[in-house]
Amino acid sequence: MTSRDRRGFLQVTGGAAAAGLLGAGRAGAADARARVVLVRRREVLGADGRVNGPVIHQMLNEAVAALLGEKDAAPAWRRVVKPSDVVGVKSNVWTPLPTPPALEQAIREELERAGVRPENVAVDDRGVRSSPVFQRMTALVNVRPMRTHAWSGLGTCLKNVIMFTDNPPDYHGDSCATLGAIWQKPPVAGKVRLNVLVMLTPQFHSVGPHSFAKELTWPYYGLLVGLQPVPVDATGARILQAKRRQHFGADRPISPSPHHIEIAGSRYGLGPSDPAQIDLVRLGLAEDALV
């Protein structure tokens, strides 16, 4: 890790949390490496800001193929799921910045193309606990947009599974530091096959719960895709912190600290957050990548 990367990560996650990362990791996280794919296409957003369905579908397939080292998407998806799987697609319906329906549809189509029966695929967010498909699921695809968040610092792939819990506020303490624990409990444990962090128009700053301002988003045109949540979220955090530095003209750490990302890796073994341990594969648009 370069001195700038190290300094940037400390500013993103908060000094105390990052200090634990930069020393010996726990739960095997320190020795692990992870691949994350960043794919960006300017044409994914129209002049009106609408998502181009065929383009985002292409981006998803490019990312999944690159993630698994396949030349084509079809064999890659067949490694993500098998025909006998029952697959829940955990989306996010927060009104100002939801998971794009075109991306949800692309995921569904690829799961079915890989052999999963249509009746064994469901897309949901707040209704996952009552969904018959999610109650039977053997595999989970986790997809949500990246944004700043009043309780956890950042809305992340890690946080996206909180709706599987009996009482989400139980995990709000210490800036949602224990979100990683959810991933070790039923029905999530061992079932997440793919994490997709939507970086089309991320929100890089907010004040207060449920705060949204379009002027605090920007067209980044990207998706981050990985097998483990921590390296995906850590990469997204670096991008948002770089945007904040660019926007504010100074290093202004995300607040509250999104240290749940580092803790999920070091305490719960959900992948590395150190950029030096993340193999970032870049596809498409390179301009203003910020990472």
Pin down the residues of each PLM region.
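N-terminal and secondary-structure boundary signal
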Residues: 1-291
